[in-house]
Structures are given as C-alpha cells and as structure tokens.
C-alpha cells in the first residue's frame, strides 16, 4: 500500500526544514505555500524560506545562544543551516546570508527531491492525517480562523506585546526586594523601588527615547490593544500615569526599610528555575538600544542582561504551554504538529530548529515510531521544554538564550567560561542522544 504523504503547511524556514527532514526519512511530503498566488503583507518573492527582516541568523560563536543552536542543527543535518553556511556573507561575528541565493537554493533543493511535492496556493483549513503547521506570524486569515476554532479562542494571539526578559543573576538583589502586593500569598515578585527623583528622571528619558515604527498592517491590529499600551505611551500621557499603572507602589513596602517607594517596577518569574524575570507591564516600541539605555536606569537593573527585549508587532501564535508537547505535537491531536513562530519560538534559527523536530517526529509517526524530545540540556531541547511548560497565563514568545538551560550545578562568575560549559554539555548530550534517531 502506498504511504500517505505528510502535509506541511507553510514554506518558511520551519516548513522548509520540516519538509526536508520528512523526505530524507523516506516519507512522501506535500509542501503547501500560498505564494505567489497570495502574498502576506511582508513577503515579496515566491521562494521558500524568504527572510523578510534581517538577513542574519545571529552570532556564529558556539558559546553564544544562537551560535550553539547553529552547531546543534549542523550535527542534526539541518538543510537550512547547511544552506546558510553555503551562502554566508561577511557580517563580523554573525551568520548572515545572501538572502536571494539562499532562498533560491533552498527552493531548488526541495523541488529536486523525489519525495517532495510542491503545491502553490492557500490552505484554508487544517487537513486530516499527519500535518505540520508552519504558517508563521502572518498566517492567512482563513487558516488562522480554523486554527482559532481548533485551539479555542483564549489560546491564540494575533499581536505580540511583550515585555523585556532579564537574566536573574544580573539583577542587583541589594536593591530589588521580593514581595507580593499587600503581602498576599508568598513573595512572588522582584520589586525595583524608585524615589521621586529617580522616577521623574526615568520618565523623562522614557518620553525622549526613540521608537520603532509599526508597519501599516501592524498598526491596524495594534489599535485594538488599549490594555497593552507601550510603557512609553503611558509615560507621555501624564506624570503619574505609570504610577497608577505598571509601576504603582500601593501595597508594596521594602521590609528592609519599612518604607513605601514612590514607584515600583515589578519583575515576574518567567521559568521554573527562576533564572529569567519579566518586566511586568513594560511592553514597548522603543528601539533596542534605547530599551537597554533607559531600562538600566531603573534601580537594581543597572547591569541587567536582557535575553529578550520588548516588542510590539503582528504575530499569530498559540499558547504552546496549554496546547503542545515538547515533541511539538498538539496534546488534543497527536498527528498535528507545529513549528516556528506560530508556537512561540522567536528568530530564524529557532524556526528552523523547530521545523527539524516537527519534521522528524512527523516522519516517525508515519513510520510507526515513537516521537522524540531532545535533552533539555541542549539549546533546542531547552527552548521546546520552555514553550511547552511555561506559565500559560503569561506566555510570550521566547528566543534561544542561556537562561533557559538547566543550571550547571556550580557557580561560574566568568560569563565566557560559563557559556562555554553550557556549550560543551549541550553538544556532548546531543551527540549521545543522536543514537535515538535510528
């Protein structure tokens, strides 16, 4: 009996990688891409894996988060990273590509594979059978509506208004204090107190800071999100607007001094290990350099290390912790898998990495094998563990970063040495794990 082809919807980085891994496993695959019959607001070519923003895949060095993920994908046989290496252009310490040659080569490579069938045109609903969804942040309206129905209205977002996330070890605990408002429950927030002078100076710089312009199609979506206003917009509305919003001091006092601050920036724990902390209510459109400059004015955050800076943009993504397994299968339908920005991973390399696992596991399902999850000590394993186990209530997309990796079990002050240890452990564990792929 002929094997039923797996369907991959979306020809971006995740879908391209997924389709390749399926075909390489000896399973036929249909790759659906709506371009050129229908273009999203951000795409301009009909090539697979079109890079619509930067042409950079991030830092190359393997003791950097992106570089470590590159190296893991090289070990796993990623076609996206292989072609990125082949079409690399000089970019200092980053892996950047000639985007035209990169997209053309990937398109030709997949088109020449005997087990890959291209279908150009929009897919308006989720098909039956084994399916990989990789439709990205600009998923077409009809398919987004069907996915919305499948996941439930409360488990899907259409706009990403995210606050910065900070490495816990970089927060000055001599200034920041643990407490919950009105001392309700356990002390769950790190609180950075400000006096009046500090607050007014912070607000002044926040109002002057340069912003990133939303694209037209993003502006239309953003205007509905009054509850997610950028922190700089609140600052501009009046001297005390923030003090009645995200930085309100009521119900908080520093037990060390007994005093109530004039304003308080709260940080909420983002991961189980308490290594990542989210700036509550600090979604922002500020340029990244400006975010670092202004937010490091906050007492306790003078040396803050940001693993993710704030963003506000159009981004269709699901509540992965509620819906997904670390194998990238949907809990309620294990034959449906997803990858890329749709599941809340952020960045080109993470999209390709998720595509690798979704494609690998889709093929395993078709071949009657058990799906696999990667070791959480690897960057890819840690990222997928995070997106499938973070708090569903506060879930926001996450890029690769060392803060999501399990603790090394020892204190290493030197950042290069610490990251090098993470890298060595990750690559060793991945090498051992690869025997499961047979």
Swiss-Prot record:
Tagged with keyword Transmembrane helix: no
Cofactor requirements of the protein: FAD
Domain of life where this protein originates: Bacteria
UniProt key word Methyltransferase: yes
GO CC terms, sorted: cytosol
Keyword terms: Cytoplasm, FAD, Flavoprotein, Methyltransferase, NAD, NADP, Transferase, tRNA processing
EC number(s) stated in the UniProt entry for this protein: 2.1.1.74
Subcellular location, record wording: Cytoplasm
InterPro entries the UniProt entry points to: FAD/NAD-bd_sf (IPR036188), MnmG-rel (IPR002218), MnmG-rel_CS (IPR020595), MnmG_N (IPR040131), TrmFO (IPR004417)
GO BP field: tRNA methylation; tRNA wobble uridine modification
Chief subcellular location: cytoplasm
Annotated disulfide bonds: none
PANTHER family on file: GLUCOSE INHIBITED DIVISION PROTEIN A (PTHR11806), METHYLENETETRAHYDROFOLATE--TRNA-(URACIL-5-)-METHYLTRANSFERASE TRMFO (PTHR11806:SF2)
UniProt family annotation: Belongs to the MnmG family. TrmFO subfamily.
Record-given protein name: Methylenetetrahydrofolate--tRNA-(uracil-5-)-methyltransferase TrmFO
Naturally occurring in which organism (per UniProt): Nostoc sp. (strain PCC 7120 / SAG 25.82 / UTEX 2576)
């Amino acid at each position: 009996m002929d094997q039923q082809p797996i369907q991959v919807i979306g020809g971006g980085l995740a879908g391209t990688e997924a389709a390749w891994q399926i075909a390489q496993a000896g399973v036929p695959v249909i790759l659906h891409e709506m371009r050129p019959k229908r273009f999203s607001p951000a795409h301009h070519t009909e090539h697979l894996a079109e890079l619509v923003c930067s042409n950079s895949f991030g830092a190359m060095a393997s003791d950097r988060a992106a570089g470590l993920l590159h190296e893991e994908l090289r070990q796993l046989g990623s076609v996206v990273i292989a072609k990125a290496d082949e079409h690399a252009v000089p970019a200092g310490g980053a892996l950047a590509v000639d985007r035209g040659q990169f997209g053309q080569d990937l398109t030709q490579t997949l088109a020449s594979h005997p087990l890959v069938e291209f279908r150009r045109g929009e897919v308006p609903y989720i098909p039956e059978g084994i399916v990989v969804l990789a439709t990205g942040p600009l998923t077409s309206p009809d398919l987004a509506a069907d996915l919305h129905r499948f996941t439930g209205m409360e488990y899907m977002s259409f706009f990403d208004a995210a606050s910065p996330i900070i490495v816990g070890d970089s927060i000055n605990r001599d200034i920041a204090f643990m407490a919950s408002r009105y001392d309700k429950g356990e002390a769950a927030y790190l609180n950075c107190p400000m006096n009046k002078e500090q607050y007014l100076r912070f607000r002044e710089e926040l109002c002057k800071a340069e912003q990133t312009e939303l694209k037209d199609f993003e502006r239309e979506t953003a205007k509905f999100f009054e509850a997610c206003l950028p922190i700089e917009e609140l600052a501009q509305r009046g001297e005390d607007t923030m003090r009645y919003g995200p930085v309100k001091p009521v119900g908080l006092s520093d037990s060390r001094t007994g005093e109530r601050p004039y304003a308080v920036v709260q940080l909420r724990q983002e991961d189980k290990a308490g290594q990542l902390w989210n700036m509550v209510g600090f979604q922002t459109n500020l340029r990244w350099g400006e975010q670092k400059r202004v937010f490091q004015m906050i007492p306790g955050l003078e040396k803050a290390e940001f693993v993710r800076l704030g963003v506000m943009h159009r981004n269709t993504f699901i509540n992965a912790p509620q819906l997904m397994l670390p194998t990238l299968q949907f809990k309620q339908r294990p034959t449906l898998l997803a990858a890329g920005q749709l599941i809340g991973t952020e960045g080109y390399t993470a999209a390709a990495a998720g595509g690798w696992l979704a494609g690998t596991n889709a093929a395993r399902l078709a071949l009657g094998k058990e799906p696999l999850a990667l070791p959480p000590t690897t960057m890819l394993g840690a990222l997928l563990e995070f997106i499938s186990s973070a708090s569903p209530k506060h879930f926001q997309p996450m890029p690769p970063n060392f803060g999501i990796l399990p603790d090394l079990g020892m204190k290493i002050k030197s950042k290069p040495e610490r990251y090098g240890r993470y890298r060595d452990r990750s690559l060793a564990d991945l090498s051992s794990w690869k025997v499961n792929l047979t």
